[in-house]
Amino acid sequence: MGGSSSKESPRGGGSGRRYERSVSGSSSYSSAWDQSSYYQTPNHPSASPVSSYNSGRQTPKNLERKYSRIADNYRSIDEVTAALSHAGLESSNLIVGIDVTKSNEWTGARSFGRKSLHFIGTTPNPYQQAISIIGKTLSVFDEDNLIPCYGFGDATTHDQDVFSFNPNDTYCNGFEEVLMCYREIVPQLRLSGPTSFAPIIERAMTIVEESGGQYHVLLIIADGQVTRSVDTDNGGFSPQEQQTIDAIVRASEYPLSIVLVGVGDGPWDTMRQFDDNIPARAFDNFQFVNFTDIMSKNIDPARKEAEFALSALMEIPSQYKATLELGLLGQRTGHCPDRIALPPPTYATQSMRNSPRTSRSTSFQNKPYDNGVSSTPPSTTHNESQQQFCPVCLVSAKNMAFNCGHQTCAGCGEDLHVCPICRSSISVRIKLY
């Protein structure tokens, strides 16, 4: 299972009380919903709890879904929060996942003044803005106000793991502490890749399981799409894409909603179509929102924040309702991924990924960050291998050169407007082979 701190936290200990509140209010909750026909996708074959629940029910095409009609003319976050409450959302726990892949260094070229999207300055960066807006909107629905917060895609996790923002995987107390931890840890990180959302989704499933089946919202903030190599066949998926799709399907067995917020320049075409490529799920548990498109509008800042919050959360009440109707709320599946978070990175000479997964040592608190300089130089073979691969996707070989002399793979290079290495404007692209 996950870290012991998760089980000992007030969130885990209060699962019974919170679940009783949700169920006891379900009758009044239902009255807030407008009814309309809908098509619910068939259950994933491995979703045994869902399958057994539906065994005596009508076929998916004949089921009815109760949608809340949430308008889109709100002027403040408070109005959006009130609308969510009126629509029936009673209880929600937030989990935050932050993309710290290397592409964050150049995907803010147009939308963030050519700065890294993780740049910490006097004004909030896109990640800080998204955390603040969603945190403020959902805080009234979170009884214990504890927020698990994780990073993925750095030099210790790549596309295989997540790291916690706190020692021993303790949770942040409110979104203000999430922002504080973010400001402290992000400047020390070695951004890397590739990008996969599977590890953070699996960690969220583990948290839901440990809580006894409380409803959670996983907020993933990312600067780019799941890594896709140019070698991937048309109509096929890269390993990272397939793992992410499988994780989203499996997550529909849990009372868990996934909101993916795209920050930076994109492109986001694949993520907009991602939902259509996901096979049958117990319920539609995935929502993508383009943060940059909304926040670049020429309207009042408060209106922009309200529009973003609404776009990100407007499906939450209906998804919460689905977990009630499917009997997912307050239940343990008995077969969660048992995803354990790594401790905050220190980038010691030995990668944390090579240390025992169950280790929760807090000794790193007394060790200074090495600012990217290892006391033991990496092997020449490793360096040479790294230099052969595209610095953007870290998967494909370099086969496209720019006017500045730097290289990427052709798949990534076609979408770039500035060089990811020197940030010069790209005016010439040369296919090497």
Curated annotation (Swiss-Prot):
GO cellular component: a single term: plasma membrane
Gene name per UniProt: RGLG5
Lipidation (N-myristoyl glycine): G2
Signal peptide limits: none
Region (Disordered), start-end ranges: 1-61, 340-383
ZnF locations on chain (RING-type): 390-423
UniProt name for this protein: E3 ubiquitin-protein ligase RGLG5
Predominant subcellular localization, coarse grouping: membrane
